[in-house]
């Protein structure tokens, strides 16, 4: 699984990469591996695995959601997943990444410069604090996250950023139906409602994946998100 197979998988979805996009993904991989030696960005470093489990996996929401030029916030993107592979694919997207670790922000800033990405901003902050700020609260068309947190927790971290009528998109693994069922109350309390859920298997390794789409139906109550750490310790239930 290298660049060629990555291209063939995307071609199955009617996505054809330009030479510039090919180069951007190639450089992304090189920088990820290089910086990973001095800071913990990912446990996945084999080329075939990075292309499949990071790049391809990050792009899968576009198989179900029409990305164009939306204003998107990525919560806890780590090494830039899923928003930066989506940005490479859809250059008109306006991306904001919020991450609590300043070292990662340093990597992402360098990465964006090297890949010559415009319309990207990085913020060193906790989602619980940024979600209260007038600079971020309910101004985004889409909040996106590829995180291990349960849906009840993730919804509290992400839905406050989304404007009414916008969407929260979560990239999840196996067992997501249970998570969504458990998180139904939290999603509703925060102003969201489940609008779509797409299950599929990641090629080659056939691991379960799910794209969960929550529509922001009404404004999030002012008390949310709660203080840093509280959503995780005391999920809305």
Swiss-Prot record:
Q: What's an example of a GO molecular-function annotation for this chain?
A: rRNA (guanine-N7-)-methyltransferase activity
EC number, as in UniProt: 2.1.1.-
Detail the disulphide connectivity of this chain as listed in its UniProt entry.
none
Could you tell me which residues belong to the region Disordered?
216-237
Primary location group: cytoplasm
Q: Where in the cell is it found?
A: Cytoplasm
Source domain of life = Bacteria
Q: Which UniProt keywords apply?
A: Cytoplasm, Methyltransferase, rRNA processing, S-adenosyl-L-methionine, Transferase
Name the Gene3D superfamilies for this protein.
Vaccinia Virus protein VP39 (3.40.50.150)
| One Pfam family matching this protein | GidB
Q: Name one GO cellular component term.
A: cytosol
Q: Where does S-adenosyl-L-methionine bind?
A: 76, 81, 127-128, 146
InterPro entries linked: rRNA_ssu_MeTfrase_G, SAM-dependent_MTases_sf
Q: What does this protein do?
A: Specifically methylates the N7 position of guanine in position 535 of 16S rRNA.
The UniProt similarity line reads: Belongs to the methyltransferase superfamily. RNA methyltransferase RsmG family.
Q: What is this protein called?
A: Ribosomal RNA small subunit methyltransferase G
| Species of provenance | Shouchella clausii (strain KSM-K16)
Q: Which gene encodes it?
A: rsmG
């Amino acid at each position: 699984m290298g660049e060629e197979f990555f291209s063939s998988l995307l071609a199955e979805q009617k996505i054809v990469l330009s030479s510039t996009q090919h180069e951007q993904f190639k450089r992304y991989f090189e920088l990820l591996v290089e910086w990973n030696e001095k800071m913990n960005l990912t446990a996945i470093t084999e080329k075939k695995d990075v292309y499949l489990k990071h790049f391809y996996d990050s792009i899968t929401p576009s198989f179900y959601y029409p990305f164009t030029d939306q204003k998107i916030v990525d919560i806890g993107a780590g090494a830039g997943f899923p928003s930066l592979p989506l940005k490479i694919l859809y250059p008109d997207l306006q991306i904001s990444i919020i991450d609590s670790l300043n070292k990662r922000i340093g990597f992402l800033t360098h990465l964006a410069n090297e890949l010559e990405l415009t319309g990207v901003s990085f913020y060193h902050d906790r989602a619980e604090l940024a979600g209260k700020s007038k600079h971020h609260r309910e101004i985004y068309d889409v909040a996106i996250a590829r995180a291990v947190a349960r849906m009840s927790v993730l919804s509290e971290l992400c839905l406050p950023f989304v404007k009414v009528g916008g969407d929260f998109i979560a990239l999840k693994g196996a067992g997501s139906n249970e998570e969504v069922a458990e998180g139904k109350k939290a999603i509703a309390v925060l102003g969201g409602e489940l609008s779509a859920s797409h299950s599929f298997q990641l090629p080659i390794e056939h691991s379960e994946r799910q794209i969960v789409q929550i529509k922001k139906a009404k404004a999030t109550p002012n008390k949310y998100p709660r203080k840093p750490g509280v959503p995780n310790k005391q999920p809305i239930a």
